[in-house]
C-alpha cells in the first residue's frame, strides 16, 4: 500500500520495525524513467510504500535510513 503522507509512513515504518525487528527491512529504488524514488518497508506480511518525485522528499531518504540504523544499533 502506498502512503501519501511522509509523517504517517515514517511512524508506521518505525512501528513495524519495533513489532518485528528481525524480519523488517527497508529498501529504496530510483525509477529513472519516471523520475521517482520508491521507499519500501516490509516484514513479508505488511508492505509500506512511499513514492515521490520531489527533490525535497529525497532528503527524507537519509532521515529514514538514520532511523533504521539507530533502531538496529539499539538492540
Curated annotation (Swiss-Prot):
It comes from the Eukaryota. One of its GO terms (biological process) is negative regulation of translational elongation. One of its GO terms (cellular component) is signal recognition particle, endoplasmic reticulum targeting. Its main location: cytoplasm. InterPro entries: Signal_recog_particle_SRP9/14, SRP9, SRP9-like, SRP9_dom. Pfam families: SRP9-21. Keywords: Cytoplasm, Ribonucleoprotein, RNA-binding, Signal recognition particle. Transmembrane segments: none annotated. The keyword Ribonucleoprotein applies. It is found in: Cytoplasm. GO terms for molecular function: 7S RNA binding. Component of the signal recognition particle (SRP) complex, a ribonucleoprotein complex that mediates the cotranslational targeting of secretory and membrane proteins to the endoplasmic reticulum (ER). Srp9 together with srp14 and the Alu portion of the SRP RNA, constitutes the elongation arrest domain of SRP. The complex of srp9 and srp14 is required for SRP RNA binding. PANTHER family: SIGNAL RECOGNITION PARTICLE 9 KDA PROTEIN. Belongs to the SRP9 family. Heterodimer with srp14; binds RNA as heterodimer. Component of a signal recognition particle complex that consists of a 7SL RNA molecule and six protein subunits: srp72, srp68, srp54, srp19, srp14 and srp9. This is Signal recognition particle 9 kDa protein. It comes from Dictyostelium discoideum. The gene is srp9.
Amino acid at each position: 500500500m502506498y502512503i501519501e503522507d511522509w509523517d504517517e509512513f515514517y511512524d508506521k515504518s518505525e512501528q513495524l520495525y519495533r513489532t518485528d525487528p528481525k524480519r523488517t527491512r527497508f529498501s529504496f529504488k530510483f525509477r529513472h524513467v519516471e523520475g521517482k524514488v520508491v521507499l519500501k518497508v516490509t516484514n513479508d506480511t505488511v508492505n509500506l510504500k512511499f513514492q515521490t518525485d520531489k527533490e525535497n522528499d529525497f532528503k527524507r531518504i537519509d532521515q529514514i535510513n538514520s532511523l533504521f540504523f539507530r533502531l538496529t544499533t539499539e538492540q
